């Protein structure tokens, strides 16, 4: 059977597509992967996708050429794993193939697709969706079993390995600056200041900074020079060694949840101009006079939709299982909150238990592949 996968951003590619592609290959299916246009792209998606062993790789590209190429795709099933549903519908309609979609929340274009999501609370917010577990958890399990012999892609590692020591009470703290180069560039001095302020409060605290697989060595050296000890290794291996994490809203919130890592999720207002916005709103937000106001309005809409909650695991429950800060937040305020959290041993233990309780079972990729209609029309 031929299966076409569509995705856009770096989190979806490595956290969703990877386990699904591995499972499809294990079942003997032919897999084509389309990398869609994405304002959130890191620039290294094609390099990462080349490790997945798919039979056909297209993109990232846009414009009329992409649209025409999709009309020529011959496939038995389309699975959309991120991106505008317009693209998945295009291939499904041209190939007369069923369209499946995996998403964390409601989005335009789901009508006509079979929709799957990770958690029951998400399914309740998406009409007709079925909760099958989190693909990100399957990706972390791939990290733990990573080897070419087992069909899992091997990643390049950075110069600074996972050389945690056992500090005398300060804790092992993992910084996650994200996959988008503009945000990482702005985050370097900000996180360096946060590390210095944290060490002033907890001298024994040991900081490492986790990077996506294909961050250039030159950039890693900049972070190492700033004392932030970069680590370029599978998230599923590094996160399990951490006592605490500092991150931003995004897919890695769920990675940390599955690994049971207590975390502080921070969204400083000073980074607002660096956050990409998709579609026409993104074009308008880039205008010099009105752009910042539009970004602030977009941020307010998101906060209002989730009652002011920014950490993804906190949106699954009425409890604050991850600490969070947003608004006019400074590195010093962030360090102070981290020091408070790290000094509360009972609170950390409780957070680990609550995060792991939310995690659920693995196997989402297998369940999604089980839902692919057979060639005789059965599922």
Residue ranges and their predicted role:
Residues 1-379:
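Nucleotide-activated sugar donor-binding and catalytic core shared by glycosyltransferases
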């Amino acid at each position: 059977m031929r299966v076409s996968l569509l995705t856009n951003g770096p989190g979806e590619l490595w956290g969703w597509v990877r386990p699904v592609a591995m499972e499809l290959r294990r079942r003997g299916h032919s897999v084509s992967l389309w990398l869609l246009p994405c304002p959130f792209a890191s620039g290294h998606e094609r390099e990462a996708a080349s490790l997945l062993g798919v039979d056909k790789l297209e993109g990232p590209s846009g414009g009329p050429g992409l649209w025409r190429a999709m009309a020529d795709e011959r496939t038995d099933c389309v699975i959309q794993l991120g991106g505008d549903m317009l693209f998945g519908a295009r291939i499904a309609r041209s190939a007369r193939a069923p369209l499946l979609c995996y998403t964390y929340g409601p989005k335009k274009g789901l009508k006509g697709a079979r929709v799957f999501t990770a958690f029951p609370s998400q399914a309740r917010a998406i009409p007709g969706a079925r909760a099958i577990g989190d693909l990100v958890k399957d990706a972390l399990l791939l990290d733990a079993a990573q080897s070419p012999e087992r069909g899992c892609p091997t990643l390049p590692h950075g110069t600074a390995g996972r050389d945690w020591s056992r500090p005398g009470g300060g804790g092992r703290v993992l910084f996650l600056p994200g996959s988008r180069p503009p945000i990482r560039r702005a985050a370097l001095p900000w996180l360096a200041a946060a590390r210095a302020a944290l060490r002033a409060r907890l001298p024994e605290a040991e900081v490492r900074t986790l990077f996506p697989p294909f961050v250039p060595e030159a950039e890693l050296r900049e972070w190492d020079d700033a004392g932030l000890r970069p680590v370029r290794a599978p998230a599923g291996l590094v996160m399990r060694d951490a006592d605490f994490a500092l991150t931003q809203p995004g897919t890695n919130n769920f990675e940390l949840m599955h690994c049971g890592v207590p975390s502080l999720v921070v969204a400083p207002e000073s980074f607002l101009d660096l956050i990409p916005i998709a579609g026409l709103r993104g074009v308008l937000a880039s205008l010099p006079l009105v752009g910042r106001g539009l970004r602030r309005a977009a941020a307010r809409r998101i906060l209002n939709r989730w009652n002011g909650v920014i950490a993804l695991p906190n949106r699954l429950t009425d409890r604050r299982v991850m600490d969070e800060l947003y608004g006019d937040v400074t590195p010093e305020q962030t360090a102070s909150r981290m020091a408070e959290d790290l000094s509360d041993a009972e609170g950390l233990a409780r957070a680990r238990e609550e995060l792991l309780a939310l995690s659920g079972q693995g196997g989402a990729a297998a369940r999604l592949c089980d839902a692919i209609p057979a060639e005789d029309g059965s599922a």
